[in-house]
Amino acid sequence: MKKNLKFVLFSLAFLVSAAHINATIGKDPALKSKDVTYSIGNQNFKGYIAWKEDGKAVKPGILVVHEWWGLNDYAKMRADMLADLSYVAMAVDMFGDGKVYETAADAQNAAGYIFSHPDLLKERITKAYDILTSQENVDKQHIVAVGYCFGGTVALNAAAIGLPLEVVASFHGGLTDFKASEMMKNTKVLICNGAADAFVPQADIDNFKSEMDKYGITYEFKNYEGATHAFTNKYSTEAGKKFNMPIAYNEAADKASWQDMISFFEKYFPAK
């Protein structure tokens, strides 16, 4: 499903259409969100931006890249959780029109198409970056990317192609044929990996570490005992049974990895 990503940066012109600001989320009236619709060529994309009204006029920004299912409620929930930490978080739309896939086969095809068209990946993640940094309450100099499964791989490769990200945090993301680059030297990388993830063999881990060491990139690689692929998503156990995939939710790994991310942020990307 995953292919080596090699492509060149290019500039984008974009038009943003912001939708209504949503009502308060959950029980915290300070937590706000809005939908944003934007275009690349003739295709529309639907992002989701969350923030907390806590007296800070400008905050660091976080791109949240969804799993291969698409921009669903899970990705938006993670954006809300990051907003609660005093960041502005944007759950991005990598497939267009806010598409969410219901079957593993369709999701795999969609993700595979993105990875087999690296210019498309670059165009879409860069556009999302431009949307986030255009927000008045975002500190344009301090942006990171957080990704889950498919999204973790996208986030890593976004840094590798030169997107100016201070931090990348990948949760159970694929590492197949990953190639680092000189352009990643200023990006700190956190990998949160399930030790029992059948989709991330030791050879991929060894290659990843070798690539990072080659360019002197600061990174931490966390392994969570007994955790499989998609260990942070409570829906994954049901999906694994439904589609006969070796994935399952792991509460201990979910909580530990979230705390590891917070600790990593405190070192390299504190909310200001």
Residue ranges and their predicted role:
Residues 191-193:
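Short beta-strand/loop motif that positions the catalytic acidic residue
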Residues 125-185:
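Primarily recognizes the serine-hydrolase "nucleophile elbow" in alpha/beta-hydrolase
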Residues 215-272:
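C-terminal catalytic histidine-bearing segment of alpha/beta-hydrolase fold enzymes
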Residues 35-137, 234-248:
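Serine-hydrolase catalytic machinery in alpha/beta-hydrolase-like enzymes
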Residues 8-18:
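Bacterial N-terminal signal peptides
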Residues 196-200, 229-230:
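Acidic catalytic loop of the alpha/beta-hydrolase fold
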